[in-house]
Amino acid sequence: TADQVAYKKQLEADEKKLDAEIASITAKIKAEEASGVTPSNRYDGGTFKWPTTSTRITSPYGDTSDRTSPHKGVDIGAVRAGVSGDPVYAAYDGKVVIAHRQSEYYSTAGNYVMIYHGNGLYTRYLHLDSLNVSVGAQVTKGQKLGVMGNTGNSFGAHLHFDVMLDDGKTRQYVNPMPYFNK
């Protein structure tokens, strides 16, 4: 349908903007590390905290049942189906590198936060109703980032949570579940 074509074009445009922004962030981090600035974060292989109070996965990593490409993360439905407001927590210690409101940048992701945990590891928290953090903030595992919502391209209150690895040369989304089960 025309709506699906328009959505796919918007998603592709958002992905290109995001790729450019992440490349810029990664280059800045690598330059700081190369200049001798001690990174404030070094992911040490520890176990992640589950990012919200609900454990109801509504779309798993890699799912293709209702999309044209594999799902890059997991969707976690609200405790009360369709009702925004569940707290969203940092899965691990890190630095907030993106804290966007829907109107500012990516319409498909809605309000979202991205955290750099060190060693090329990032987590993203999409479709938030509101944000409690801003770019540059150091966050700790379990710290509240905002609340679950229904912003962007979303069909009900949920959290899209994903894990991305970026070594400055290649970027890939990976299954987040093993980070919780170490």
What is each model feature region?
Residues 1-43:
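Alpha-helical oligomerization segments with coiled-coil/rod-like character
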Residues 26, 61, 80, 100, ...:
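A generic structural motif
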Residues 38-41, 56-92:
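Short glycine/threonine/proline-enriched tight-turn/helix- or strand-capping micro-motif at secondary-structure
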Residues 49-54, 58, 172-177:
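Proline-centered structural pivot motif
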Residues 57, 88, 94-96, 136-148:
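A structural signal for short beta-strand/turn segments enriched in small hydrophobics and glycine
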Residues 62, 99-101, 144, 150:
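Short, surface-exposed secondary-structure boundary micro-motifs
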Residues 69-71, 85, 90-135, 157-165:
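Zn2+-dependent peptidoglycan hydrolase active-site motif and core
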Residues 107-119, 137-182:
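Conserved, short, structured surface segments that act as functional micro-motifs
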